[in-house]
Amino acid sequence: MAGHRKLGLPTDQRRAMLRNLVTSLLKHGKIETTETRAKETRSIAEKMITLGKRGDLHARRQVLSYVQEELVVKNLFDNVAPKYTERNGGYTRIIKKGPRRGDGAEIVILELV
């Protein structure tokens, strides 16, 4: 049964962390994080961009319920989503950076294509 990754966090903390990562990705265009967090974030971010492509009021409200900053939502609907009108999915890429010095966790850069 496919589901989501637990990421070693309780549910509320995991949801909060993923909301922050998605907001940062849409705000800055790229983020640096661990590989498993990036894979989980990518899934959610792609859904947000697909909602942005729809462009109606309901989609905007759905994104607003997840993304924390209104300016990021406005930017998503006005600038980011129109770039991907011809593309069906695959809005992000993961670039491996190497292991983290402290614990050896695989660090990657997650960026919008």
Swiss-Prot record:
Gene coding for it: rplQ
Record GO terms (molecular function): structural constituent of ribosome
Record note on quaternary structure: Part of the 50S ribosomal subunit. Contacts protein L32.
Entry similarity comment: Belongs to the bacterial ribosomal protein bL17 family.
InterPro entries tied to this protein: Ribosomal_bL17 (IPR000456), Ribosomal_bL17_CS (IPR047859), Ribosomal_bL17_sf (IPR036373)
PROSITE patterns: RIBOSOMAL_L17 (PS01167)
Keywords, sorted A to Z: Ribonucleoprotein, Ribosomal protein
Protein name: Large ribosomal subunit protein bL17
Keyword Lipid biosynthesis: no
Protein's GO biological process: translation
A cellular component annotation (GO) from this entry: cytosolic large ribosomal subunit
Pfam families registered for this protein in UniProt: Ribosomal_L17 (PF01196)
